Design a protein with these regions (language model features):
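Structural preference for beta-rich elements and adjacent junctions enriched in aromatics
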Residues: 20-289, 365-368
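Bacterial Sec-dependent N-terminal signal peptides
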Residues: 1-26
C-alpha cells in the first residue's frame, strides 16, 4: 500500500512539473503602439511624446492582482498603475511609459529593497525557464553555475527602481549581462516630486532592447530580437510595493503565475501593432529586394500600403514589369541601377525610387559589358 501511494505521489509530481512546463502564452493579450519614425519618444522626462498613444494601449492595475494575498481588491487610494508600451519600426527597442500613484514611496535603501517595477521580456516567444532557480537539472548543475551560464539569456528580467535613492542604479538586471541597462541598449528618465515615505505620483519613460540571446560575454556575441509589425512577444511585469516594512505590501502581477519572473512561458502576449491609420497616407509605396547569391537575379517584393490595383516596375536597365512581386535577371554586372516602383489604386498613387541600392555580379558568368 505504501509503495502504491509513493508511486502515485511520484506520478502526480511528474504530471505537475509537466503541466507547468507546458504553459503557453496564447491568450489575446495586449497591444504595443507603433510610433511613427518622425515621432520617436525622447527619453527626457517630457512625456508629451506619449500623447499620441490612444488609451486602448494602456494597461492599468485592473489587469493585475496581488498574488501575495494581502490585498483582495484594488484600492487606487493606496496604489494605482498605468503602463503604455511602444515600438518603432526599424529599431529593436521597446519603449515604456510607467505612471503610478503610491501612498507611501519606499526608496531610502541601497539594496534591492525598493518600490520596484519588475519587467520580463521574451522577444521571440521561446518560453521556458531563464533563471538559475528554475534550472532543469538542479542535481547536476549548481545554482551559481546556472546563473553565469543560463540566466537572463533567452529572456531578460529587469528590476526597475521607482525611484532609486540617490546614487543607486536605475535598474537591477537580473543576470550577468549588466551591459543591458546602459546606452545604446537602454535609457531612462523619471519625473516625481516626493521624498521617501511620502505619497505622490511618479512618471517614468525608458526603453530596453530585447535579446533572443543575451550573452554573458557581451553584446558583440549576442543576438537582438528582431521587431516587426504584427510580431507577438512575451512580456510581463509586476509592481513590488513596499510601505516602510521589511516585507513587501504586495506583489501586483500582470501574470496569473507568480513565477513568471523566471519562466517566460508564464508571461503575457503582446502584439507589435502597425501604425494607426491617422499616421498614414491613403496610398504609400515601398519595396524590398533580395539578390540570389552569385547571380544577377533579383527578387522584388512590394511592401506598399493601401488599396492598390496596379504596379509598374522600372528596373533601371530599360525593362519593366507590371507584376506585384516580380523576379528579374539583369544582363549586366552593375552597381548603379536605379529602380522605381509606381503603384495606383482608387485612392491615389505613389512612387518609390531607390538609387544604387540594387547591385549585382555573377562571378561564374561575368558580363562582358564594362562596369563603367
Amino acid at each position: 500500500m505504501k509503495k502504491s501511494l509513493a508511486l502515485l505521489w511520484t506520478a502526480l509530481l511528474v504530471m505537475a512539473a509537466s503541466a507547468q512546463s507546458d504553459i503557453q502564452v496564447t491568450e489575446p493579450g495586449f497591444k504595443v503602439f507603433q510610433f511613427p519614425r518622425t515621432q520617436i519618444p525622447r527619453i527626457d522626462g517630457d512625456f508629451t511624446d506619449w500623447d499620441i498613444v490612444p488609451d486602448a494601449y494602456s494597461v492599468s492595475i485592473d489587469e493585475m492582482w496581488d498574488d501575495t494575498g494581502k490585498h483582495k481588491n484594488i484600492e487606487r487610494s493606496t496604489l494605482d498603475i498605468k503602463v503604455k508600451v511602444g515600438w518603432v519600426k526599424g529599431l529593436n527597442r521597446l519603449y515604456f511609459l510607467y505612471e503610478a500613484y503610491d501612498d507611501f514611496w519606499d526608496f531610502n535603501q541601497l539594496g534591492l529593497h525598493n518600490d520596484t517595477y519588475e519587467i520580463v521580456v521574451d522577444g521571440d516567444l521561446s518560453g521556458g525557464p531563464h533563471t538559475d532557480e528554475f534550472r532543469l537539472n538542479p542535481k547536476v548543475k549548481r545554482r551559481i553555475d546556472a546563473f553565469f551560464e543560463f540566466q537572463n539569456q533567452h529572456a531578460q528580467n529587469y528590476h526597475i527602481m521607482t525611484p532609486p535613492t540617490e546614487g543607486k542604479s536605475w535598474t537591477m538586471v537580473w543576470g550577468p549581462q549588466q551591459w543591458l541597462k546602459y546606452l545604446p541598449y537602454a535609457n531612462y528618465s523619471y519625473d516625481y516630486d516626493f521624498s521617501h515615505g511620502e505619497s505622490g505620483r511618479l512618471r517614468m519613460e525608458f526603453y530596453i532592447t530585447p535579446f533572443d540571446y543575451a550573452s554573458p560575454e557581451g553584446p558583440e556575441k549576442s543576438v537582438e530580437s528582431r521587431l516587426y509589425e504584427n510580431k507577438k512577444i512575451g512580456l510581463c511585469w509586476a509592481v513590488i510595493d513596499y510601505d516602510g516594512e521589511t516585507q513587501n505590501n504586495g506583489f501586483w502581477n500582470l501574470s496569473k503565475h507568480h513565477k513568471m519572473y523566471g519562466n517566460a512561458s508564464m508571461q503575457r502576449l503582446f502584439t507589435l501593432m502597425p501604425l494607426e491609420p491617422q499616421f498614414r497616407k491613403a496610398v504609400e509605396c515601398d519595396w524590398t529586394f533580395t539578390v540570389v547569391p552569385d547571380t544577377r537575379t533579383v527578387c522584388f517584393r512590394d511592401q506598399s500600403y493601401g488599396p492598390i490595383t496596379s504596379w509598374h516596375w522600372d528596373f533601371g536597365d530599360g525593362t519593366t514589369s507590371t507584376e506585384q512581386n516580380p523576379t528579374h535577371t539583369y544582363a549586366r554586372d552593375y552597381a548603379h541601377y536605379v529602380v522605381t516602383l509606381t503603384v495606383e489604386g482608387p485612392e491615389g498613387s505613389a512612387r518609390c525610387c531607390k538609387v544604387w541600392e540594387v547591385c549585382v555580379r555573377d562571378m561564374s558568368h561575368p558580363s562582358l559589358t564594362p562596369y563603367d
